[in-house]
Amino acid sequence: MSSNNVPASRRKCVGVKVGSVMIGGGAPIVVQSMTNTDTADEVSTTQQVAQLALAGSELVRITVNSMEAARAVAGIRARLDDMGCHVPLVGDFHFNGHKLLTAYPECARALAKYRINPGNVGHGRKRDEQFSLLIETACKYDKPVRIGVNWGSLDPEMLARIMDENARSPDPLGASQVMHKALITSALESAARAEELGLARDHIVLSCKVSGVARQQDMIAVYGALAEQCDYALHLGLTEAGMGSKGIVASTAALAVLLFKGIGDTIRVSLTPEPGGDRAREVIVAQEILQTMGLRAFVPLVAACPGCGRTTSTYFQELAESIQIYVREQMVIWREQYEGVENMSLAVMGCVVNGPGESKHADIGISLPGSGETPVAPVFVDGQKTVTLKGDNIAGEFRMIVDEYVRTKYRKKAANA
C-alpha cells in the first residue's frame, strides 16, 4: 500500500474485452448494473437499459431465463443500436442457459458476455455436459464469460467433497472457512475446466457472491484469498444487499475495503429499489463509491456542511441539493464537450465558521450566511474570492458562475472526438 490513506495499486490481472469495454488489465474499474424488467418485453427492457446506460452504467446485464427472453435479446440489441445506445449487454443464465444459447444463436451473437453459475448448471454428468455446451458456445461466438459462484447455490457434490476432506483433516476449518474454500474452489475449478474446453484466459471473469448484509467480512476474506490464487479479472458485488441506506452501507462497507486493497475490476451495487424507485440509483451509488475513493471521476463533486445551530436557514441545503442535481443533469452535455470536467469540485457551505476555508479548497465554493450573519454570500473560484452574492437569485447567479467556469477552465473536445 502506497500510504495509510491512499488505495493500493491495482492487482494485476488479465484484461477481458466485453464489447467496447475492457475489464481488468489495468483498465479503469467498470460500473455495471442489471435490469429488473421482463426481458421478453423488448420495449420496457430497451427503455430500462437505455436509462441505466444514460446514468453511467458501462455494462448492463439482462435476465435470459426463457425461450421468450432469448428470442427478444437480438431485438433489444437492435433497438438500442437504433437509439445510438451501444452499451454492451450481458446475458444472465441459470439452469437452462445451455439450451437457450444453443437454440437461439441470434441471442448468443447479440450478447457481449455470458454470466453463468456453475452451481446450477446441472449435477453429475449432466453438469459436465451442460457446462461444456455453455463454454463451447462462448468459444464459437468469441464471447467472454463470467463464472459467478453464489453462496446460496453451490454445487452440492463439490460442497460435500470439501466438507468430507475437512472432516478428515487433523486441523479442520470452521464452518465459515469451509464455505469460503468451497466458493473459491468452485470458481477456480470451473475456470480451469473452461480453459480446458478452449475458452481463453482473457475471456474469463470470476465472482464469488456472498449472501446477506451481515456477510461483509466473508466477502472480504473470500475475495482476498481468490485474488492471491489467480490472475483472472474479478467482479465485485454483495448480492441481496437490501434497500435504501441499509443496502448502500452494506455494499459500500464490503466494496470499499476490497477496492482499497486494489482488488476488483468491475462492480455492481445490488440495491433493492424502493417501491416506484429509480433503478439507476444503483449506478449512481457505484459511481459515488469509486469517486469518493479517488479511483474514478464521473461527475463534479458537491461538498456541503451538515448544518448546525448556526445554520438556522435551510437555504444552503436547498442550494446544495439543487446544484448537485444541476451538475448531474449538465454532465450529459458537458462530458461530450469538455475534457476533465468530471474532476471539478464544488462546495456549498452554511456559515462563516468553515464556509470560507472549505470554499477555498474547492474549484468553486460559496459560503452562505448563518444565523445572525450579514446576508451576503462570498464566492471563491480557484481559492480566490471573486464576487459576493446577495438577494433572491443567489442560486441562479451561482449556476451562471459554474457554467462560466466550465466554459473557460476546461478544454473543448475535438468535434469528432
From Swiss-Prot:
Where does this protein hold [4Fe-4S] cluster?
305, 308, 351, 358
Q: What InterPro entries does the database record attribute to this sequence?
A: Dihydropteroate_synth-like_sf, IspG_bac, IspG_bac-typ, NO2/SO3_Rdtase_4Fe4S_sf
Q: Which reaction does it catalyse?
A: (2E)-4-hydroxy-3-methylbut-2-enyl diphosphate + oxidized [flavodoxin] + H2O + 2 H(+) = 2-C-methyl-D-erythritol 2,4-cyclic diphosphate + reduced [flavodoxin]
Q: NCBIfam families, per this entry?
A: ispG_gcpE, PRK00366.1
Q: Which domain of life is it from?
A: Bacteria
Give the pathway listed in the UniProt entry for this protein.
Isoprenoid biosynthesis; isopentenyl diphosphate biosynthesis via DXP pathway; isopentenyl diphosphate from 1-deoxy-D-xylulose 5-phosphate: step 5/6
GO MF annotation: an example: 4-hydroxy-3-methylbut-2-enyl-diphosphate synthase activity (flavodoxin)
Organism of origin is: Nitrosomonas europaea (strain ATCC 19718 / CIP 103999 / KCTC 2705 / NBRC 14298)
GO biological process per UniProt: isopentenyl diphosphate biosynthetic process, methylerythritol 4-phosphate pathway; terpenoid biosynthetic process
Record EC number: 1.17.7.3
What is the recorded function of this protein according to its Swiss-Prot or TrEMBL entry? Converts 2C-methyl-D-erythritol 2,4-cyclodiphosphate (ME-2,4cPP) into 1-hydroxy-2-methyl-2-(E)-butenyl 4-diphosphate.
- Which keywords fit this entry according to its UniProt record? 4Fe-4S, Iron, Iron-sulfur, Isoprene biosynthesis, Metal-binding, Oxidoreductase
Quote the record's cofactor note.
Answer: Binds 1 [4Fe-4S] cluster.
Q: What is this protein called?
A: 4-hydroxy-3-methylbut-2-en-1-yl diphosphate synthase (flavodoxin)
Query: What cofactor requirement does the entry state?
Result: [4Fe-4S] cluster
The Swiss-Prot or TrEMBL record describes its family as follows: Belongs to the IspG family.
